[in-house]
């Protein structure tokens, strides 16, 4: 009798499947998926660098994780994307430590950035790069690729794409006709075009087909009652930025709405870099150098390149300029929120490591500025995850938390939907399925 009772139990043991090994499990965690979905409590497992499963409650029976993380009270978000950077070696570890697992580099030495972008590495962010930017004669940047004709534009795009560029960046001294030629050639090769505008308005560039407009450039020019004056000012790089920035505080809100509607109709994505706009407005602030985020910046960089008085002197900026820049910032913020409300897309970017735009920390500040301007926290997170991945053409494998996607994840100590500043309260950063940073 005892034997007959034991036989079924022994059979179950003999034929039960072995425990399913996974590399990592995060249990009992709230998941903000990046596209607006929220799962209040779940367990996520990772295997071979990808999200294996998302299950309600505890780890599924039969799953044996190599590393088991209790996520109770925490929130898991997708790895963050900064869609406007200029990579340096010292910036990469800072970016990853702040949860930035992907970056789009929009100008750098091609011999440095393009080979780096080809190398997949779990100890730094994924890089999609433009190589050298394309600009007209007299460019502010000595390493820009100079184009003067339509033939130049087409050849430059062919060369950039052949060299591995994932995006083409056009700059301030290019007129609309040459921007259009760049877009046409890039489109034939399935490559997007980003634009920092100077000699073309944002509306013109959107109609020409650029994928994204950086820094909200060309918008003040399009909304101004004297656009020719602003367009001409961009012949001097800093002078053009200064005049456009000051113009924002004077613009008619109704005219800005018209421009926003035209941009939305053109389907262009805005990459506002509000953290950069704010950083420039704070150069005369006495507490600027006391920002705790500066602790991550090498002393040699702070001493040589980040002296606020020296920056203002070289740019010809005065305390009055700073006041005008501060007055412009809330107008920029409201424009961003309004653009999203009318159905336009905004993607988070910072221009780090521009002075006082600290790698990683500045992206969290970018999101805070969006929310302070009227965007919801969920929309701000989407701008740095799902929408950013879509702009970069990588939404099939990153940008949201879904089974099968790459395990680029950030575990937060609080809920960023309730308080956007929680994106900076990082407990773990997971890059390609491996824990890259742990507080």
Residue ranges and their predicted role:
Residues 5-23:
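Bacterial Sec-dependent signal peptides at the C-terminal "C-region" and cleavage site
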Residues 31-43, 56-57, 358, 376-381, ...:
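Acidic, glycine-enriched loop/beta-strand segments at the rims
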């Amino acid at each position: 009798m005892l034997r007959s009772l034991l036989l079924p139990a022994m059979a179950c043991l003999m034929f039960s499947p072995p425990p399913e090994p996974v590399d990592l499990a995060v249990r009992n965690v709230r998941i903000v998926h990046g596209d607006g979905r929220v799962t209040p409590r779940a367990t996520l497992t990772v295997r071979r660098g990808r999200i294996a499963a998302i299950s309600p409650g505890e780890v599924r029976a039969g799953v044996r994780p190599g590393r088991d993380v209790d996520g109770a009270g925490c929130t898991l978000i997708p790895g963050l994307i900064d869609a406007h950077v200029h990579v340096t070696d010292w910036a990469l570890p800072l970016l990853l430590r702040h949860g930035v697992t992907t970056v789009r580099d929009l100008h750098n030495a091609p011999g440095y950035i393009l080979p780096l972008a080809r190398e997949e590495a779990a100890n730094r962010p994924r890089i999609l790069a433009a190589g050298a930017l394309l600009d007209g004669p007299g460019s502010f940047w000595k390493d820009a690729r100079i184009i003067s004709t339509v033939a130049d534009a087409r050849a430059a795009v062919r060369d950039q794409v052949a060299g591995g560029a994932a995006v083409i960046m056009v700059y301030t001294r290019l007129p609309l006709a040459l921007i259009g030629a760049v877009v046409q050639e890039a489109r034939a090769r399935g490559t997007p075009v980003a634009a920092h505008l100077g000699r073309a308005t944002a509306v013109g560039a959107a109609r020409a087909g650029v994928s994204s407009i950086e820094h909200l450039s060309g918008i003040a020019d399009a909304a101004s009652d004297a656009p020719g004056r602003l367009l001409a000012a961009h012949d001097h790089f800093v002078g053009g930025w200064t005049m456009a920035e000051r113009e924002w505080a004077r613009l008619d809100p109704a005219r800005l709405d018209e421009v926003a509607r035209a941009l939305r109709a053109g389907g262009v994505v805005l990459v506002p870099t509000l953290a950069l706009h704010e950083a420039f407005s704070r150069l005369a602030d006495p507490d600027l150098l006391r920002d705790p985020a500066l602790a991550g910046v090498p002393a040699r960089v702070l001493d040589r390149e980040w002296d606020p008085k020296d920056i203002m002197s070289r740019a010809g900026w005065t305390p009055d300029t700073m006041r005008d820049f501060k007055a412009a910032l809330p107008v920029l913020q409201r424009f961003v929120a309004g653009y999203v409300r009318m159905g336009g897309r905004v993607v988070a970017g910072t221009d780090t490591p521009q002075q006082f735009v600290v790698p990683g920390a500045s992206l969290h500040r970018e999101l805070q500025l969006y929310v302070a301007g009227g965007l919801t926290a969920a929309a701000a997170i989407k701008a740095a995850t799902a929408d950013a991945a879509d702009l970069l053409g990588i939404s099939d494998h990153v940008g949201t938390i879904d089974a099968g996607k790459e395990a680029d994840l950030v575990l937060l100590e609080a809920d960023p939907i309730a308080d956007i500043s929680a994106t900076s309260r990082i407990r773990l950063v997971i890059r390609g399925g491996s824990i890259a940073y742990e507080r």
